Each structure stands twice: as C-alpha cells, then as structure tokens.
Design a protein with these regions (language model features):
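Acidic/histidine-rich catalytic neighborhood of metal-dependent amide-processing enzymes
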Residues: 59-154
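Solvent-exposed, polar/charged alpha-helical surfaces in well-ordered, non-transmembrane soluble domains
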Residues: 7, 11, 72-79, 116, ...
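Soluble metallo-hydrolase cores and metallopeptidase-like ectodomains found primarily
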Residues: 1-65, 75-86
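Active-site-adjacent substrate-binding region
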Residues: 33, 130, 139-263
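Hydrophobic, small-residue-rich alpha-helical packing segments that form membrane-like cores
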Residues: 7, 15-23, 29-39, 53, ...
C-alpha cells in the first residue's frame, strides 16, 4: 500500500492493538496479448556453441532493481567485451526476456513465461548448444554480507575454481564471493535449467529489501549501490572469459548423483 494509506492506518492503531478495514482493489487483465523476447549476439568462432546472458525487461512499477539494472548490466558487459576487442570462441547471446513477472492467466505458476517459451517453443535447439545461461536479477543491490553465484549443481566445481583464481575486484561486501546451489524457481534461469541448459544467477533473495520493497512502488533508485553493481559487472564479465576458454564444457555431474542419493536415503 502507499505511504499515505499506511500513515492513516498507523494513526488508527495508535490507541488500539488491532482494527478491521475493508480493502477494495480492482485488477484488470488483458488476455491474449503478445510479448517479445529481444535477442542480440556477439558472433564467436563457433556459432553453434553459445554463452547466454539473460535478464527480464518487464517489471512491477518502475522495477529499478527488478530488473532494469540487470538489463543494463547485460549491455554494459557486452559493450566492455566489444570495446576490448575480444574475439569470443563461443557466440555470446544477450536475451532480454519478457513476461517474467507474469505471463499466464488462471494459473498458480504464472511467472517466467517468456524464458520458458524462449527455450521450449522459440529456440528448443539451444539445448545442447548453450553451454551456460548467466541470468541476472537485482544486481545493483547488496544482498546480505557477500555476493553469491547461485548455480545448478553441475557448475559448482568450476565456479569454485574460478573464484579461487580471481584477481582483486571492486570491494562491495565484507565477505568473499561464494557459490551456492541449487538454483531456485524464482527466476528465468530455472526455466532454462529444466530444459537442459546449465544455468546460474547472481543470488538475490537475501536481505530486507525482499520483504519491504520487492515488487512494490518502492523499488527505485534510492537503493542503488554502485560498488555492488561494479562488482557484478567485473565478476560476470570475467566469468564469460573463463567459460570461453574451455575446450570442453566444464560440467561436473557427481554432485547431482550425490544429491539424488541423499534424497533417496531420506525417503
């Protein structure tokens, strides 16, 4: 609710512990609309082997963090790669996804529709060609005490080795960057992963912002953190370079088997 309405409720609660109110809201849904995923490429020496960068451009209200800064981050990384004269081995695909926040009527599973349709309907041939999806969410905001890359199990070992060999990056958190797994259903990397594309995302679910400002009119530039934003540019641009140097896709399947075994033992 708005600050104005909240102030009125707080005033009513000044002299009593609880009150009963009537909430009157009207939502209008326009059915059968078309949205567009927007795709660009930096051609590589091997056009059929790709690294995908993804972020969604739809939002609730202004969506400054969620997810406009992420779309801008993709452009920033792409510009840095081009300006550096980098000639990738893999084709770098940049995809601004639609319908992440909402895209299906009459369903409990109404989000990440654009990404789902991108990989299952528009480009199912990407499976087996995209060696990694680097998805971005709320990248200009501090989440907890460290940056984290939330990854599918198969990339954890490679990412841990990558982080161990990193040069000094912009200092934005008191603790060192870490890897966590598995991925979650909150974001577009999940739709990619269930199709068979190994995926990861900057971890974004920690911190009070998610409880007080997420998906509200308060998601604006007031919470812009330049140091965190710079760190994510550096962290993922260098990750693209590291992935591009691999002759064989660096997937490690033993963590998946271990997780399956653990799940069976708990049954």
């Amino acid at each position: 609710i708005s600050r104005k309405d909240a102030a009125g409720l707080l005033e009513l609660l000044r002299d009593q512990e609880e009150i009963t109110v009537t909430f009157d809201a009207e939502s209008r849904v326009t059915r059968n609309c078309t949205t567009y995923n927007i795709v660009g490429r930096i051609p590589g020496k091997h056009p059929d082997r790709m690294v995908l960068l993804s972020a969604h451009y739809d939002s609730y209200f202004d969506g400054f963090q969620d997810d406009n800064t992420a779309v801008a981050l993709m452009f920033g990384i792409a510009k840095a790669l081009l300006d550096s004269g980098f000639q990738p081995n893999n084709t770098i695909v940049i995809c601004a996804m639609a319908s992440e926040e909402w895209g299906v009527v009459d369903s409990n599973f109404d989000w990440s529709t654009g990404a789902y349709e991108q990989i299952f309907t528009a480009h199912p041939e990407w499976v087996g060609k995209v060696i990694a999806d680097l998805n971005f969410e709320l990248p200009a905001l501090a989440h907890g005490t460290r940056a984290r890359i939330r990854s599918c199990y198969e990339y954890v070992s490679f990412l841990e080795e990558y982080l161990a060999d990193l040069p000094n990056l912009t200092i934005a958190y008191p603790e060192e960057t870490a890897v966590t797994s598995p991925i979650e259903t909150w974001s577009d990397d999940f739709s990619m992963a269930i199709a068979g594309v190994p995926s990861m995302v900057n971890d974004f679910t920690g911190g009070s912002f998610m409880e007080t400002h997420y998906h509200s009119q308060f998601d604006n530039d007031e919470f812009y953190d330049e140091q965190v934003y710079r760190l994510h540019h550096e962290l993922f641009a260098l990750l693209i370079l590291a992935l591009d140097e691999t002759a064989v896709v660096p997937l490690q399947f033993s963590p998946v088997v271990q997780r399956i075994r653990k799940g069976l033992e708990q049954c």
